[in-house]
Amino acid sequence: MPTIIIETFINAPAERCFDLARDIGLHCQTTSKTKERAVAGVTSGLIELGQSVTFEAVHFGVRQRLTSQIVEYDRSKLFVDEMTKGIFASMCHVHEFETQDKSTLMRDTVTWKSPLGIWGIIADALFLKRYMAKFISERGVSLKDIAENEKQ
């Protein structure tokens, strides 16, 4: 199963970064390139342990839906969402927030299993792993910019 790890250093407290990362409206704002929007479950505000959200987005020209649930939660330090329905055979996204002085190291670890057997494995190697890394990295940069520059 492919895994990507993206680390983003943010000059803001971990609690602020943690809450921004859980904000459903902000998630949609920071993924606007894929026309992402929350269509079911928690569709606004901060998602909590046990809650789920369904996002609809356009990836590779195809409109898709992905539902994930928060399965682990440690306030200001970590939350984990797992796909419960969507295009992947499985997907898990671990969001970690490590305080460093007065700043935060935000670490996103995403692991997935693509569908379609060998074809999914080939897609992972040819383009999907790179696409996922870019998608998560760009969202991290957007969260960093908001955390460091906007009052929310």
List the predicted regions and their residue ranges:
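Generic structural detector for well-ordered beta-strands
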Residues: 5-11, 56, 69, 96-98, ...
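Beta-strand elements of well-folded, non-transmembrane domains
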Residues: 10-12, 59-61, 72, 87, ...
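Short strand-connecting beta-turns/loops that link adjacent beta-strands
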Residues: 13, 75-76, 100-103
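Hydrophobic ligand-binding cavity/cleft-lining segments
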Residues: 1-43, 48
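Short, surface-exposed coil-to-beta transition loops
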Residues: 3-5, 63-67, 90-93
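Glycine-rich portal/gate segments that line the openings of hydrophobic small-molecule binding cavities
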Residues: 38-85, 105, 138-151
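Beta-strand/loop substructures that line and gate deep hydrophobic ligand-binding cavities in soluble
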Residues: 80-134
